[in-house]
């Protein structure tokens, strides 16, 4: 059995076992501009220098193809070439880049300046995802006002947590970011977190 098949099997198995319930609703746009500006990064409260971002890794298919084919896929900006895991880490973590957001005053949706990916919640795992191709999946739920709910999670019926719920997060030694109902007991592999808006220059970003 190939590594990819084993990975898929464990991912499906654990995803079914860790299904969570949450009720995300649209909220009024409020206080989304951060302390000083409309462009911001999300810092984990109480963990200085730890931000919400993406960790990239090379998939099994990339490692088995020729250098020429891999280079062509990279130049073509194929979204599946380097899968991204939404996680929290410090800015100097290898293969990690913080997500930089800007406020949309009309819809309250955060958008990454670098890749313009739209966030959504996976209704099976509860994981917050930004993968540009995965929004077509049956279990994708677009969330209007997601940033506001992350900043004020207890007010809007959700908890935000960093989790090690599946095979991928264990292998990559980096947690996923998940959302749960406010009254739900978190699994023992999850830790509740809070996020705050920080202006990029204040966080050490140019």
From Swiss-Prot:
| Annotated glycosylation sites | 26, 48, 91, 139, 152, 183
Keywords, comma-separated and alphabetical:
Cytoplasm, Glycoprotein, Signal, Zinc
Q: What induces it?
A: By zinc depletion.
Annotated Gene Ontology cellular component terms: cytosol
PTMs per UniProt: N-glycosylated.
- Spell out the protein name for this chain: VEL1-related protein YOR387C
**Major location (coarse):** cytoplasm
> Which stretch is the leader sequence?
1-19
Q: Which family does it belong to?
A: Belongs to the VEL1 family.
Q: Which InterPro entries match?
A: Vel1-like
* Pfam entry (one): Vel1p
Location in the cell reads: Cytoplasm, Cytosol
């Amino acid at each position: 059995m190939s590594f990819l098949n084993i990975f898929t099997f464990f991912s499906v198995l654990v995803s079914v076992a860790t299904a969570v319930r949450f009720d995300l609703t649209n909220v009024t746009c409020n206080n989304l501009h951060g302390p000083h500006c409309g462009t911001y990064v999300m810092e984990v409260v109480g963990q200085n220098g730890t931000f919400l971002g993406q960790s990239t890794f090379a998939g099994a298919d990339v490692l088995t193809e020729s250098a020429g084919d891999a280079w062509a896929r990279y130049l073509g900006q194929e979204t599946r070439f380097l899968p991204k895991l939404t996680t929290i880490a410090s800015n100097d973590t290898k293969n990690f880049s913080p997500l930089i957001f800007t406020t949309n005053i009309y819809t309250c949706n955060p958008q990454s300046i670098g890749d313009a990916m739209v966030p959504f919640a996976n209704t099976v795992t509860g994981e917050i995802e930004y993968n540009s191709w995965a929004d077509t999946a049956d279990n994708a739920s677009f969330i209007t006002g997601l940033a506001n709910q992350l900043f004020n999670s207890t007010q809007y019926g959700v908890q935000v947590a960093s989790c090690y719920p599946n095979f991928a997060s264990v292998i990559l030694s980096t947690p996923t970011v998940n959302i749960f109902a406010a009254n739900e007991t978190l699994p023992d592999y999850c830790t509740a977190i809070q996020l705050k808006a920080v202006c990029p220059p204040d966080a050490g970003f140019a």
